Swiss-Prot record:
Domain of life per record: Eukaryota
GO molecular function annotations of the record: protein-lysine N-methyltransferase activity
Gene3D superfamilies on file: Vaccinia Virus protein VP39 (3.40.50.150)
Residues forming coiled coils: none
Organism: Caenorhabditis elegans
InterPro entries tied to this protein: Methyltransf_16, SAM-dependent_MTases_sf
GO cellular component: protein-containing complex
Protein name, as recorded: Uncharacterized protein R08D7.4
Pfam families membership: Methyltransf_16
SUPFAM superfamilies: S-adenosyl-L-methionine-dependent methyltransferases
């Protein structure tokens, strides 16, 4: 059996489901029953994808067009609330993406004999006159969708300067979303292979916590510093006595790791999109083994792109005497745990042409389990 003090994720997901059911039943004056997943408005869903420069799902685009057909003012309101919204116009959200969305929407509206507002054409014209830089921004919104939760610069190209660490990837977005369920009592977080810093910085913004972001490439470390500043997080050189919303950047080479420099305790270790290079997995698991001496658990998120890399990762975890306490998947806005599915829509949307779930691992030393 497991130690009752073992850190677990699955009960948090299940309890969130129960909370939604209980809240809905209270609203309906019922004591029992089921509840459908809380659904955002079509416009807010569209706004989330647009601000994060994530491809608009086909069904969502159809829903938007349908709304425009039903309501003659919907297209104008959409333009005001999304395309010309200050959140959008004040950030360098990928211009090519915005142009493509507007062109597709205008084409669909015209095909359905919907009057396209002048403001939509004007915005398209403005975007076509803008030049993309080497870096673009992704913007993620609060639960209400009216404010910016976190924003990140990333390289225009997924492979830039010889590294993939300058781009945002799926598992980092899904890991950030998972932490909406994790209590803020875990206020010291260490992230391995931070890349753009989506997971760690978003966690620092959502919770009252201090996050240490680590990577090795100099260009990636510089981008992390930029994204910390972009999100108004305190660095370790500033006074953090008022609150713990703080993020710092440190260089950490998995292949040349000096544990004596990392003896400060952390509550949780996190990592996303780090299980892709099998040549580095033994070193990664060694680092996890050492760091877990002073941490409750490590949460690793990865996409199922290559089954052999997943198997290799699990093999090296076993060799490092680390236990997979929990393993589950997230896809299409739902966690799959055994035969059960728990809907929990993401506020960190991400689109990939490769449709694959994100796998979550809760990793702990074997001696933390009592049999």
């Amino acid at each position: 059996m497991q130690d009752p003090n073992t850190f677990l994720l699955i009960p948090l997901i299940q309890s969130e489901r129960k909370r939604k059911i209980f809240t809905k039943c209270q609203e309906n004056g019922e004591l029992s029953g089921m509840v459908h997943s809380e659904k955002e408005t079509t416009e807010l869903q569209f706004k989330r994808f647009y601000c994060s420069a994530s491809k608009i799902p086909d069904q969502l685009m159809k829903d938007i067009v349908e709304q425009c057909i039903k309501d003659s003012e919907y297209a104008e309101n959409l333009c005001n609330n999304v395309f010309n919204n200050e959140i959008v116009t004040s950030h360098e959200i990928r211009y090519k993406f915005q142009i493509n969305v507007l062109k597709n929407l205008i084409s669909e509206l015209q095909a359905n004999n919907v009057v396209v507002p002048d403001s939509m054409f004007d915005r398209l014209g403005s975007l076509m006159g803008m030049k993309e830089g080497e870096y673009v921004e992704r913007v993620y919104l609060t639960d209400g969708g009216d404010k910016v939760l976190a924003k990140f610069s990333e390289a225009v190209n997924q492979l830039s300067m010889g590294t993939t660490g300058l781009s945002v990837w799926q598992a980092s977005c899904d890991l950030a979303n998972l932490f909406r369920l994790i209590p803020s009592e875990y206020n010291r977080i260490l992230e391995l292979g931070s890349g753009c810093g989506v997971s760690g910085i978003a966690i620092a913004k959502m919770n009252d916590c201090c996050v240490t972001l680590t990577d090795y490439d100099d260009n990636v470390l510089n981008l992390l510093e930029e994204n910390i500043a972009k999100n108004d997080l305190k660095s370790d050189t500033e006074d953090s006595s008022a609150n713990n919303n703080q993020a710092t950047v440190r260089s950490l080479n998995w292949c040349d790791f000096d544990f004596s420099e990392w003896k400060e305790p952390t509550d949780l270790i996190i990592a996303a999109d780090v299980v892709y290079d099998t040549a580095l997995l033994a070193s990664l698991c060694n680092v996890l083994n050492l760091l877990l001496r002073h941490s409750k658990a490590a949460i690793v998120a990865c996409t199922r792109r290559n089954e052999s890399s997943i198997e290799c990762f699990e093999h090296h975890l076993k060799m490092a005497k680390l236990e997979i306490v929990e393993k589950f998947e997230y896809e299409n806005g739902a966690y799959t745990i055994g035969e059960n599915s728990y809907h929990y829509a993401s506020i960190f949307p991400f689109f990939s042409t490769l449709k694959t779930p994100t796998i979550f691992y809760n990793i702990q030393p074997k001696n933390k389990l009592v049999f």
